């Protein structure tokens, strides 16, 4: 299944705010569980079966908190719930029966999750949803009805015959976006009176899915452009900087004004700061292959025992700290993914060290988000589809544009910086040891921050990436997909890259024996 949605800067690129370690394998599944909770009358079920196909990475069941995420969502939790790490224990305490079954069923996407629910009213409801990358989700199927929903609106689901569906349409004031002879789905910008729908004659059951995102998708939401080339054409007509373009883009999608957009950007910076501190204070929860080291790195930097790399030392500490927080299932921001959550905070810390103000760095975050939207709109943010370049590479590319903007670069320079950074990491394999977002993901975030800073400086100096930015995205995505199609991604075989080494195989076997199903 290809992505057909236009990115929202906060819903899909700089967000969600989530507990780690993975946006595709933790945050997305949590949202899938939560949407199913809504679909089933706010968790009005006596049993739910989680099904992972053997054709998905989820069937391995260890290291990325997928089942913890789904289970938390099924209890009504969102991806930022502070107790997500303990969701399996909480579910047991509440007496919830949520078995996991591995099937051989074909699936539309490698990140597909099927949930089969038995409600207290005697109904059975099944859902098939997809974690699209970066915490974004798609509702693919409800019972036997194929749908295309993305969790950003109020979706009213009505079980009933054609007369009941017609009555619901009259009450809700809009036609269904999907229907068959016994089920219809209505999509709204505003919350519906679900009790009124349930009381309609002929309605067997009705429920409402709630948007689990900061920005509810409007009825007539439309970005003024969706690609880098489109932005440049828009600027040729309207003028303005790349920051002005970011404001115009997000306003078109969400309806938010500039103040509200800036306020949220500043809020995201606050969360990133909290993530850095949580990483520095890390107790090692959730680690398997390595131990937390960001605090030691900070001490070495402060004692000047690093090679003198200036602000790169600051970036290294911050990026590593965020990823160690992420690995412990503590709060981070998918920027654009959980696996790359440390890259932008690393660059932001370096920019702060260089003397830029909070407001300036918040502006640069919006520039980064806009560049990330171009990747989302033309490629993906999930390494299981496009390799590591769509995560670490994307984050580094976004951060390079942000740094170039604060250095005084115009739109061309910002895009050149983004292009250089992404080209540098095109072809980066997704070959984690064992599973999860630990090795090499933590290390690569620091590298991604450094690559962003170097690329920004190169672009300011006039280095030409030659390819337009949209073509850099295309090249990266095509190459990454080809690698994935040959099983060079995310440990699907466990015999490629670092996974194929003697140590890689040993670590994988130990992990399979010792790590809990999560």
Locations of regions flagged by a protein language model:
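Functionally critical mobile loop/hinge segments
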Residues: 86-100, 107, 403-518
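Extended amphipathic alpha-helical scaffolds
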Residues: 97-102, 114, 124-126, 180-181, ...
């Amino acid at each position: 299944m290809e992505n057909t949605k236009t990115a929202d800067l906060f819903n899909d690129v700089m967000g969600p705010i989530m507990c780690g370690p993975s946006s595709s394998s933790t945050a997305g599944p949590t949202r899938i569980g939560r949407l199913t909770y809504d679909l089933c009358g706010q968790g009005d079920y006596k049993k739910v079966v989680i099904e992972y196909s053997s054709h998905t990475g989820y069937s391995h069941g260890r290291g990325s908190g997928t089942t913890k995420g789904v289970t938390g969502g099924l209890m009504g939790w969102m991806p930022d719930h502070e107790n997500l790490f303990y969701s399996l224990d909480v579910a047991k305490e509440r007496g919830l029966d949520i078995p996991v079954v591995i099937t051989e069923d074909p699936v539309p996407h490698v990140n597909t999750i099927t949930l089969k629910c038995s409600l207290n009213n005697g109904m059975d409801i099944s859902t098939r949803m997809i974690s699209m990358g970066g915490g974004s989700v798609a509702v693919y199927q409800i019972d036997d009805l194929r749908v295309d929903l993305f969790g950003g609106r109020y979706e009213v689901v009505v079980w009933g015959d054609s007369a009941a569906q017609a009555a619901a349409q009259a009450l809700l004031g809009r036609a269904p976006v999907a229907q068959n002879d016994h089920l219809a789905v209505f999509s709204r910008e505003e919350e519906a009176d679900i009790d009124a729908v349930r009381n309609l004659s002929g309605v067997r059951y009705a429920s409402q899915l709630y948007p689990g995102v900061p920005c509810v998708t409007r009825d007539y939401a439309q970005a003024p452009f969706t690609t880098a080339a489109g932005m440049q054409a828009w600027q040729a007509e309207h003028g303005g900087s790349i920051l002005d373009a970011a404001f115009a883009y997000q306003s078109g999608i969400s309806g938010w004004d500039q103040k509200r957009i800036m306020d949220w950007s500043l809020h995201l910076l606050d969360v990133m700061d909290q993530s850095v501190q949580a990483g520095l204070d890390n107790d090692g929860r959730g680690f398997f292959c390595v131990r937390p080291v960001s605090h030691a790195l900070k001490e070495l930097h402060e004692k000047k025992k690093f090679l003198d790399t200036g602000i790169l030392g600051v970036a290294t500490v911050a990026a590593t700290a965020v990823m160690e927080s992420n690995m412990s299932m503590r709060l981070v921001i998918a920027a654009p993914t959980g696996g790359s959550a440390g890259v932008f905070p690393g660059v932001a810390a370096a920019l702060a060290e260089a003397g830029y103000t909070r407001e300036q760095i918040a502006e640069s975050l919006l520039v980064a988000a806009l560049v990330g939207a171009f990747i989302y709109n033309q490629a993906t943010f999930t390494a299981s589809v496009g390799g590591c370049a769509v995560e670490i590479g994307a984050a580094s590319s976004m951060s390079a544009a942000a740094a170039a903007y604060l250095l005084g670069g115009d739109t061309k320079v910002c895009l050149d910086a983004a292009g250089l950074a992404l080209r540098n990491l095109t072809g980066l394999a997704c070959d984690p040891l064992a599973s999860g977002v630990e090795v090499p993901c933590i290390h690569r975030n620091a590298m991604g921050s450094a690559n962003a800073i170097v690329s920004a400086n190169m672009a300011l100096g006039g280095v030409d990436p030659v390819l337009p930015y949209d073509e850099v995205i295309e090249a990266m995505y095509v190459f990454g997909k080809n690698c994935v199609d040959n099983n060079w991604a995310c440990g699907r075989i466990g015999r490629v890259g670092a996974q194929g080494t003697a140590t890689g195989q040993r670590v994988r076997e130990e992990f399979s024996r010792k790590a809990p199903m999560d």
